[in-house]
Curated annotation (Swiss-Prot):
Highest taxon of source: Archaea
Species whose genome carries this gene: Nanoarchaeum equitans (strain Kin4-M)
HAMAP family: AMMECR1
Residue ranges of domain AMMECR1 in the record: 1-180
Pfam families for the chain: AMMECR1
Protein name listed in UniProt: Protein NEQ441
Length: 180
C-alpha cells in the first residue's frame, strides 16, 4: 500500500471539490494512531509544500488525509496547489514514531545523541517549535550541529537556541513512502 499515492488521490479529489473516501480495507490497516507528514516536490526536487501532524493523536488514515490537504493547500510558504501542477509534482509521505524528549546534562550531548539519517527533530522553547523530517539533513548535507541549528531557525528562534538549557529537543523516526 503506497501512502504517497493515497495522498495524491486525496489532493486530486480536493482539487475537484470532492472528498476522497479512503477505502475501508485501507482504513483498517491504518487504524492506529500515528503522526504523518506529506511532502510535495516539483519534478526537479524543489519543495512545493510540506505539512503534517507530528504527534500520534489521530488514526494514521486521518493524519494522512490532514497532512496531504495541509501540504497542498495550507503551507504558508507557498500558494495553494493548482490542478495544472499535478503532473509536475511528486508526493512523499513520512509516518512518524512518537517524539521522544532527549535528556542531556550538557546541550553539546545532543550532537552525539542525534543520528543523521535516522532521527527527525522537534525543537521547542516556550510557544515556539520547529520540526525537520529525518530525510532533510541527508538531502541538505548537514551534520548534527547544522540540523539542530536549522531546527531552531524553523522554530523562529536563533540558530544557536539548542545550546540554551531551556530549549527542549525531541527526536522521532520516520518511515518514508514515495511515489514510483
Amino acid at each position: 500500500m503506497n501512502l504517497a499515492k493515497i495522498a495524491r488521490k486525496i489532493v486530486e479529489y480536493a482539487l475537484e471539490g470532492k472528498d476522497y473516501e479512503i477505502p475501508d480495507e485501507i482504513k483498517e490497516k491504518l487504524n492506529y494512531k500515528a503522526g504523518a507528514f506529506t511532502t510535495i516536490k516539483t519534478l526537479d526536487n524543489q519543495l512545493r509544500g510540506c505539512m503534517g501532524i507530528p504527534y500520534p493523536i489521530y488514526p494514521l488514515w486521518q493524519s494522512l488525509k490532514y497532512s496531504a490537504l495541509m501540504a497542498a493547500f495550507e503551507d504558508p510558504r507557498f500558494p495553494p496547489l493548482q490542478k495544472e501542477e499535478l503532473d509536475n509534482v511528486k508526493f512523499e509521505v513520512t509516518v512518524l514514531t512518537p517524539p521522544r524528549k532527549l535528556i542531556v546534562n550538557n546541550p553539546l550531548e545532543y550532537l552525539e545523541k542525534i543520528k543523521i539519517g535516522k532521527h527527525g527533530i522537534i525543537i521547542k522553547r516556550g510557544p515556539y517549535s520547529g520540526l525537520l523530517l529525518p530525510q532533510v539533513p541527508i538531502e541538505e548535507g548537514w551534520d548534527a550541529k547544522e540540523f539542530l541549528s536549522y531546527g531552531c531557525l524553523k522554530a523562529g528562534l536563533p540558530m544557536d537556541c539548542w545550546l540554551d538549557p531551556k530549549t527542549e529537543v525531541y527526536v522521532f523516526e520516520g518511515q518514508i513512502f514515495e511515489e514510483d
